């Protein structure tokens, strides 16, 4: 049994597993998950290094993927929904363990190497430089991040990881490793995948109109690994498509699931 922390919603119907992005946690999907739970069994996963799941010494996509695979069974293949980093994990799960994945949904991520991860490094540095011993209220932590992270929505997202631990605060994610291994998080393990075939199941790609993570430049790689994919661009959305346009995201997901 996998040691990953999960939240389970719903009691009947096909199973849908949600994988969050960098600095996220399973509960980021809580609102969407509850809405789907009327017709599906929903699993919200804390990926390694995040939330209440284990925090290994290094970040490795295939190890993360293997940990998610331990949650699943070939007798009950699932729809996997992954955003950003979780999108890469979802793609790798479909490629390396296709018997576990009935359908795949990728939210604003492509099967490519991303060279520019500087923005995420800024977030890591800001969180690590925050003196949590001097923080008594969450509002003080928010103020401490404001200069480095001026976007209030992003700050709110990051601060969801701030947890009370007795009389003090701590970050509920593996900041030292995530900060050090950002290049690996931007990577795509092409060499390790040479022994695998393309995933031949149905794939829905949900791209943010204002994001540059899914572009025409990446279409050949998407087609190579996922020949049955269909791309939907969500108007007005940036990278966090599911939180910026939740109703549109949910409608596209329900249609794909056949609800």
Which residue stretches match the model-derived regions?
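Conserved alpha/beta-hydrolase catalytic His-Asp/Glu region
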Residues: 133-189
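Conserved HGGG/HGGXW glycine-rich cap/lid loop of the alpha/beta-hydrolase fold
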Residues: 5-54
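Conserved alpha/beta-hydrolase "nucleophile elbow" surrounding the catalytic nucleophile
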Residues: 20-22, 82-87
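Short beta-to-alpha linker loops that shape the active-site pocket of alpha/beta-hydrolase fold enzymes
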Residues: 46-51, 110, 237-238
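Flexible "cap/lid" loop of the alpha/beta hydrolase fold
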Residues: 92-95, 100-137
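Catalytic histidine-centered segment of alpha/beta-hydrolase-like enzymes
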Residues: 237-246, 250
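Conserved serine/cysteine hydrolase catalytic core
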Residues: 167-225, 230-233
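Active-site loop/oxyanion-hole signature of alpha/beta-hydrolase fold enzymes
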Residues: 2, 34, 43-81, 89, ...
């Amino acid at each position: 049994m996998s040691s990953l922390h999960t939240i389970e919603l719903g009691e009947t119907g096909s199973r849908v597993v949600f994988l969050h992005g960098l600095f996220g946690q399973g509960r980021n999907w809580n609102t969407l998950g509850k809405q789907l739970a009327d017709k599906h069994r929903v699993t919200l996963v804390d990926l390694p290094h995040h939330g209440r799941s284990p925090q290994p010494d290094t970040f490795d996509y295939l190890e993360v993927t293997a940990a998610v695979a331990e949650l699943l069974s070939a007798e009950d293949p699932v729809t996997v929904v992954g955003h950003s980093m979780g999108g890469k994990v979802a793609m790798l799960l479909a490629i390396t363990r296709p018997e576990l994945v009935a359908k795949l949904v990728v939210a604003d991520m492509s099967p490519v190497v991303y060279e520019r991860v500087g923005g995420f490094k800024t977030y890591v540095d800001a969180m690590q430089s925050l003196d949590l011993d001097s923080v008594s209220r969450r509002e003080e932590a928010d103020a401490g991040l404001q200069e480095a992270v001026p976007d209030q929505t992003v700050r709110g997202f990051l601060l969801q990881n701030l947890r009370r631990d007795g009389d003090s605060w701590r970050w509920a994610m593996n900041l030292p490793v995530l900060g050090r291994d950002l290049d690996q998080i931007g990577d795509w393990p092409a060499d390790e995948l040479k022994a695998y075939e393309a995933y031949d199941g149905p794939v829905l790609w949900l791209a943010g109109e204002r994001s540059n993570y899914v572009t025409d430049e990446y279409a050949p790689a998407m087609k190579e690994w996922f020949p049955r994919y269909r791309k939907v661009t969500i108007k007005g959305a940036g990278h966090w498509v599911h939180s910026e346009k939740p109703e549109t995201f949910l409608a596209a997901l329900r249609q794909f699931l056949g609800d």
